[in-house]
Structure formats: C-alpha cells, structure tokens
Swiss-Prot record:
Domain of life of the source: Eukaryota
Composition skew (Low complexity), residue ranges: 31-40
Organism the protein comes from: Homo sapiens (Human)
Region annotation (Disordered) ranges: 31-131
Protein name: Putative uncharacterized protein encoded by LINC01465
C-alpha cells in the first residue's frame, strides 16, 4: 500500500458522524491521552555560558574560541612560502597528498658505466645543434 491510499483512507474515516462520537472530545481537558507520551518535566533554566543558541558566535566546550590571528607582516612568525600556516607552525616538512593526480615516474635508466646517454645519442644531438 502506498502513502496516498493511507491518506485517502484516513480522510474517509474522518466523517462528521465519527468525529461527533470520538473519544477525545469526551475526555476532560487535564487528562492526558493514552496514545501520547507523558508530558515532559519543565526544563531547567539555561546557563548563561551556553548563550541563546542562535548562532555559532559563542559556543561552550572544552576548547575556547581562538584568539584573533596577528596580521601577516615582516615581524610575524616565519612562514614557508606556499605552505599552510598550520604546517609552518608545526614545523613538519611538506607532505605530498596521498592520492595525487600526478603519476610518479620511474627514474631514468642509467647505463652501467654511469652515463645516461650513449655515444650515438650524443652524436645525434650534436648534429641537430649545429645546422
């Protein structure tokens, strides 16, 4: 059964004849309904530390709000160029992201003698350099 059929069925049951003989109308005003939960106890007065709860400006907890950061200038703490201030403050070396888009390239194969280029390759580059 879908949700629409349940609503339609409820609309059929709420006819004026049934509403006139329904039990909730016969209950006194102070009596609690059996199908509903008992009324909750009144809440204690809120602590002024918690604020009114209508914003993120002030929220309590073990962590106090951060102080205003000083303006960046020549007298401020040394900052690594291109790095995040938190990383510079931690003193950690720049770490590469775990999932980098760049595929790591294998090192250039070296000749056992230590030269990376053969004599033939060197001769070809010399021919292309001098027209």
């Amino acid at each position: 059964m879908g949700g629409k059929s349940a609503v339609r069925h409820q609309l059929v049951l709420d006819c004026p004849r049934e509403a006139a003989s329904s039990a909730p109308a016969l209950r006194p005003l102070g009596a609690a309904a059996t199908s509903r939960a008992a009324p909750l106890a009144p809440l204690p007065a809120p602590s002024p530390r918690w604020g009114l709860g209508c914003g993120r400006v002030r929220y309590p907890g073990p962590h106090p709000r951060r102080a205003v950061e000083p303006a960046a200038g020549p007298l401020s703490a040394p900052i690594i160029a291109g790095g995040h201030p938190a990383e510079a403050a931690a003193g950690s070396a720049k770490q590469q992201p775990r999932h980098s888009r760049e595929v790591p390239r294998p090192p250039v194969p070296q000749h056992p003698s230590g030269n990376s280029r053969s004599a033939l390759q060197e001769a070809k580059t010399e021919q292309t350099k001098t027209p």
